[in-house]
Amino acid sequence: MSDSLLIQDFLKPVPMAVILEDEELNDAQLGSHMQIYTDEFPDLEEAEVVLLAVAEERGTGNGVSESDSPDLIRKHLYNLYYWHPDIRLADVGTILPGASLNDTYAAAKTVIAELIAQKKTVIILGGSHDVTLAQYGAYVHHNQVIEASCIDSFINLGTGTSLRSEN
């Protein structure tokens, strides 16, 4: 439990009223079968797959610090049909934004590394592509080789895409 309290310090709860727009989930929907961090941090012992949101957008260079994209993803994800009862899911909330972009990276890396240590499959919702570096750092911390997929609405191949030299 002390590990959960440690990562909870880096997370804010899921705003269920915003996501569900004050509607209730029914038993056929995925969200009604998930352990979700709302008032109390969930017990992750039974969870196999853990959702973690990152709203950080400072790495895009567009002047936006946070995005509501993780909650928009949740809004649709929680409403999906609950089709596979053998997979147990949890949503541990959203990484709190740090004072600097590197602080957010460090928080994300810490939380992800702890979830990996607990043998959880981590799915990150939201965040700009540069947050992938924090995810990678968590696996490096555990000396694990990883394969990563970044799913987005478009592919960033333009010549105007900024690259962060400190990455």
Language model feature labels by segment:
Residues 2-51, 58-167:
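Conserved alpha-helical scaffold segments that buttress catalytic/binding sites
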